[in-house]
Amino acid sequence: MTDYDRITANPHFDMLMSAHNHVQSTTQSALVPMVVEQSARGERSFDIFSRLLRERVIFLTGQVEDHMANLIVAQLLFLEAENPDKDIHLYINSPGGSVSAGLAIFDTMNFIKPEVSTICMGGAYSMGSFLLAAGQKGKRYALANARVMIHQPSGGAQGQATDIEINAREILKTRARLNEILAERTGQSVEKIEKDVERDYWLDAKEAKEYGLIDEVLERRPASL
């Protein structure tokens, strides 16, 4: 049985594709292209994102929020179950979003056995840049005209003064943890990370490489991808 037949025969594949298609239909304003393929099981049609998932390609596009994070996590776990020794490729074009949703993806990337390469196309900002840097070291890429931005987490609170104080402490604690992770992923000192993220810190692809957020700027597809 080929990898194609084995994956599509998996009883969880159709459920995963159904959830994937639902999210794509609600997050894509344009018509999603469909591909039709022949296999030993007959003719099947897939949206283009589902077809690429079979090639171990995951797209992280748009706002990082809980529902999207759950889908990304499910795809990572599914691909690990299919082949724990083969790389997964995570393409990122995201303005960022929820810290908790982003950390769920980050922790899963580290939890699973396959190495996860990250590729920025367009832009990776805020939590998007954090997940870009979270890829396997040596396998973090950005396309030539991609942009990256890092900054500190933002948040707000209302209500009693004690509740506001509790929320403020939690934000500071989260910021410190994110800075520690970025320092480890980039090779920069925590002090430099703290200084740079005080305001929006923009980098082009070459600057992102120099900073340590990525390992290589791509103009053409390498053999590893």
Curated annotation (Swiss-Prot):
GO terms for cellular component: cytoplasm; endopeptidase Clp complex. Keywords: Cytoplasm, Hydrolase, Protease, Serine protease. InterPro entries: ClpP, ClpP/crotonase-like_dom_sf, ClpP/TepA, ClpP_His_AS. Pfam families: CLP_protease. Disulfide bonds: none annotated. The active site is at S126 (nucleophile), H151. Gene3D superfamilies: 2-enoyl-CoA Hydratase, Chain A, domain 1 (3.90.226.10). The keyword Protease applies. It catalyses: Hydrolysis of proteins to small peptides in the presence of ATP and magnesium. alpha-casein is the usual test substrate. In the absence of ATP, only oligopeptides shorter than five residues are hydrolyzed (such as succinyl-Leu-Tyr-|-NHMec, and Leu-Tyr-Leu-|-Tyr-Trp, in which cleavage of the -Tyr-|-Leu- and -Tyr-|-Trp bonds also occurs). GO terms for biological process: protein quality control for misfolded or incompletely synthesized proteins. CDD domains: S14_ClpP_2. Belongs to the peptidase S14 family. Cleaves peptides in various proteins in a process that requires ATP hydrolysis. Has a chymotrypsin-like activity. Plays a major role in the degradation of misfolded proteins. This is ATP-dependent Clp protease proteolytic subunit. It comes from Psychrobacter arcticus (strain DSM 17307 / VKM B-2377 / 273-4). The lineage of its organism: Bacteria, Pseudomonadati, Pseudomonadota, Gammaproteobacteria, Moraxellales.
